[in-house]
Amino acid sequence: MAASLEKAGLGISVRLLEYTGDGERIVAVASKVSLSRSPAERLLAIGEDEVETWILETFRRQHFSPWEHSVYTFMVEGLSRVASHQLVRHRVASYTQLSHRYSEGYLREAALKACESIGLDCPSKPAETEGGRKAAYRLYSQALERAARDFGASERFAIAAKAFVIPPTILARGDGGDGVVEAYLRSAAIYYSLLSRGARREDARYILPDALRTRIVVTMNARELIQVFFPLRMCTRAQWEIRHIAWLLWRELSRVHPRLFRWAGPSCVLRENTLRTTPASLYSYLEGVERFTQPRCPELVENKAIPGCLRQAASVAPPGDGEYE
């Protein structure tokens, strides 16, 4: 799977935009607040060793309410609307998504790539006048239709990937996706044809598949991430694209707040770590340094099969050697 994803060039990225800079300390301070009678000055003067201790204690006791005070805002770019629909099901979060009605930026990238490939002089931005816009849309439609009809599989893929996420299993067929990539291009051609004939964008978009790329800004807190999002979405049971996103996000968060996210992972890892006196890093499970003791994971995978299942889950975005120990 990892090789096919790399070959596909998914074009999906996760970028951390903002976060609670001293989030680890704030989690520890909030944990002390719930138990200590000390004044605020003493609580805020917590040392690094105490930060480590309080984070560990809240994790072991599954007392995650203090973790809600560490918040993360990130942008996912290039994901499909299939994946974005799964993402927004996580309700303890805030979302702002690229408008499907007012923006056709990803589609235009594909159209311009098609224009370039066939040597058609197309405007990079349609003119402001109605006639100018319709003329540009006609050219986009013609270029995309020709690409769908006349180009080989690799050329079609290079154009379609600008606007659509193409599943690796489809690419692995070796026949250009058995007409799928061609269908993507034809849908984009029809979309621009409709616009050139005066259709509204809000209506023309009905022809487009859910594979269309989008962009979304998400804000979540550490508790939602470690208790809900990562256990569900880093697991092999998750659909491959959102699993890819979850592992990319985990890598980003592990860099800025390793003491909070080193024990995070799919549901098998979260369960194992909450059973242990001392939790272990996700990397140590991946490398087989630590072994699972649970008879089966929450997804009913038997004990002996859990390590392989975890490695399969990580194959969409594996960490480097020694990363996040």
Curated annotation (Swiss-Prot):
Residues annotated as binding FAD are 65, 89-91, 97, 221-223
Pathway-wise, it operates in:
Pyrimidine metabolism; dTTP biosynthesis
The answer, when asked if Metal-binding is one of the entry's keywords, is no
The residues covered by the ThyX domain are 12-267
Name the Enzyme Commission number(s) assigned to this protein: 2.1.1.148
- Pfam families given in the database record: Thy1
User: Which cofactors does this protein require?
Assistant: FAD
* Domain of life of the organism encoding this protein: Archaea
The record's keywords, sorted A to Z, are: FAD, Flavoprotein, Methyltransferase, NADP, Nucleotide biosynthesis, Transferase
Q: Look at the named UniProt entry and state the broad enzyme category this protein falls under.
A: transferase
Read off the PANTHER family from this record. Answer: FLAVIN-DEPENDENT THYMIDYLATE SYNTHASE
Q: Which family does it belong to?
A: Belongs to the thymidylate synthase ThyX family.
Designated name of the protein: Flavin-dependent thymidylate synthase
